[in-house]
Amino acid sequence: MSTFVELSTKAKMPIVGLGTWQSPPGQVKEAVKVAIDAGYRHIDCAYAYYNEHEVGEAIQEKIKEKAVRREDLFIVSKLWPTCFERKLLKEAFQKTLTDLKLDYLDLYLIHWPQGLQPGKELFPKDDQGNVLTSKITFLDAWEVMEELVDEGLVKALGVSNFNHFQIERILNKPGLKHKPVTNQVECHPYLTQEKLIEYCHSKGITVTAYSPLGSPNRPWAKPEDPSLLEDPKIKEIAAKHKKTSAQVLIRFHIQRNVVVIPKSVTPARIHENFQVFDFQLSDQEMATILGFNRNWRACLLPETVNMEEYPYDAEY
């Protein structure tokens, strides 16, 4: 079983990466160092996580120790949609690059498709509490991001939380220079994303799954929300393979050729989440897990639900 997916640029993207969303400052640096020691080579970051400087420190320390070379790492970051305007985009990108202490990114994604009004807040609001949108769209941002590729600052571009209509608009954009190589979306057995994955793969676009364990630590979780890690069927499959529920949930994506970025700051779990290449789920087990789908999302971004371009209004 390959530990990489090949992107349309021919670059190899490690199929398991470390997610850093909601990794608290003070813990994320250690988490990245532990991950690199455990064999991870793909680290998923974002401007909006407000922790890239610590991730950068960890990467630098590991490179200095000769534990890893920069060219063996695959570092991803994301542009937040308050920065779609050219000048702000270049500044946001430069901040990411400086914080990560790198001279290039392997992959740069548009974090969310809806353009938001520039400002210090992630969700700029008016006095009534309505989120303020921008007339500058993800297509405008894409052109500026293409320049970053041409300048050698970014190896490839992608999107996150886009539906297939939005991806189609990038693919059909007149004068497109660089196609998106991945769409990073929430994906787990309660949200199997079969149609979106099929669409992306048909266009030569990989899919990256975030919240592969169902985002159990999200701050807005409700007691009645379903829990994947506690699901008896998942536990049963895990016991059969002498693995944990988390390992089964990660393996599920690998066998669909979907890149997966579990987040943890706990050293034992970081190691555990990478021990997923020494077993195989049967076709029957895969079918059982796919049968869990209920189109349930942990991450809805409710702030923007009534705005144009809300990505989850479409079926896929």
UniProtKB/Swiss-Prot annotation:
Belongs to the aldo/keto reductase family. GO terms for cellular component: cytoplasm. Reductase with a preference for aliphatic substrates. Can also act on small aromatic aldehydes, steroid aldehydes and some ketone substrates. It is an enzyme of class 1 (oxidoreductase). Detected at very low levels in urinary bladder, testis and jejunum. Monomer. Its EC number is 1.1.1.21. Induction: By FGF-1. Up-regulated by calpain inhibitor I (N-acetyl-leucyl-leucyl-norleucinal/ALLN). Its main location: cytoplasm. It comes from Cricetulus griseus (Chinese hamster). PANTHER family: ALDO/KETO REDUCTASE (PTHR11732). PROSITE patterns: ALDOKETO_REDUCTASE_1, ALDOKETO_REDUCTASE_2, ALDOKETO_REDUCTASE_3. NADP(+) binds at residues 211-273. It is found in: Cytoplasm. The record marks 78 as: Lowers pKa of active site Tyr. This is Aldose reductase-related protein 2. Keywords: Cytoplasm, NADP, Oxidoreductase.
